[in-house]
């Protein structure tokens, strides 16, 4: 189940707000300019879907977002625990960074934890299948796929070059709860 936990960015020990209610999550995130919606990822995928399979099955959803926001490129990120780059990628994504464009993800299977550092708070968003998340350009954040990742998400970009991170060097991600599933 999707969830949102909010912390002060100066106290990782005590959440100041938590919910698993999609409407409450959407309101909290919309209030800070973050788009969160529950979509329907109902298409059946194979056990280890290729990028081509995922893109073909969800072309309608991609087309909707492209028409709405003018995205120039999209791809699929799919991670399983047997991926030889799993630990390396987890470490990379756990480093706080920003993008000069919105970061848009539609989760079609599995889960991951997006952590936003915004307005003196940390917003930890557990995204699962059916979740659409759009993080505004310039928002400091990190992503935790967990020690045993299992997720597939469609990523959409304003930039035809795709995912380009600008790391902040802040070690704040080291002190907040991680995804342990």
Swiss-Prot record:
The record's EC number reads: 1.13.11.54, 1.13.11.53
Give the UniProt record's GO annotations in the biological process aspect.
L-methionine salvage from methylthioadenosine; L-methionine salvage from S-adenosylmethionine
The protein's GO terms of the molecular function aspect are: acireductone dioxygenase (Ni2+-requiring) activity; acireductone dioxygenase [iron(II)-requiring] activity; iron ion binding; nickel cation binding
Q: Please give the Pfam families that the UniProt record associates with this protein.
A: ARD (PF03079)
Instruction: Tell me which residues are marked as the site May play a role in transmitting local conformational changes.
Output: 102
Query: Which reactions fall under this protein's catalytic activity?
Result: 1,2-dihydroxy-5-(methylsulfanyl)pent-1-en-3-one + O2 = 3-(methylsulfanyl)propanoate + CO + formate + 2 H(+); 1,2-dihydroxy-5-(methylsulfanyl)pent-1-en-3-one + O2 = 4-methylsulfanyl-2-oxobutanoate + formate + 2 H(+)
Site feature May play a role in metal incorporation in vivo: at which residues?
A: 96
User: SUPFAM superfamilies annotated for this entry?
Assistant: RmlC-like cupins
> What keyword terms does UniProt attach to this protein?
Amino-acid biosynthesis, Dioxygenase, Iron, Metal-binding, Methionine biosynthesis, Nickel, Oxidoreductase
Cofactor: how bound: Binds 1 Fe(2+) cation per monomer.
* Residues annotated as site: Important to generate the dianion: 105
Residues binding Ni(2+): 97, 99, 103, 141
**Cofactor annotation:** Fe(2+); Ni(2+)
* Binding positions for Fe(2+) per the UniProt entry: 97, 99, 103, 141
**UniProt keyword Amino-acid biosynthesis present:** yes
- Look up the record and name the pathway of this protein: Amino-acid biosynthesis; L-methionine biosynthesis via salvage pathway; L-methionine from S-methyl-5-thio-alpha-D-ribose 1-phosphate: step 5/6
| Family to which this protein belongs | Belongs to the acireductone dioxygenase (ARD) family.
Known partners and oligomeric status:
Monomer.
Function, as annotated, reads: Catalyzes 2 different reactions between oxygen and the acireductone 1,2-dihydroxy-3-keto-5-methylthiopentene (DHK-MTPene) depending upon the metal bound in the active site. Fe-containing acireductone dioxygenase (Fe-ARD) produces formate and 2-keto-4-methylthiobutyrate (KMTB), the alpha-ketoacid precursor of methionine in the methionine recycle pathway. Ni-containing acireductone dioxygenase (Ni-ARD) produces methylthiopropionate, carbon monoxide and formate, and does not lie on the methionine recycle pathway.
Q: Provide the protein name.
A: Acireductone dioxygenase 2
The species this protein was found in: Pectobacterium atrosepticum (strain SCRI 1043 / ATCC BAA-672) (Erwinia carotovora subsp. atroseptica)
What is the taxonomic lineage of the source species? Answer: Bacteria, Pseudomonadati, Pseudomonadota, Gammaproteobacteria, Enterobacterales
Q: Which gene encodes it?
A: mtnD2
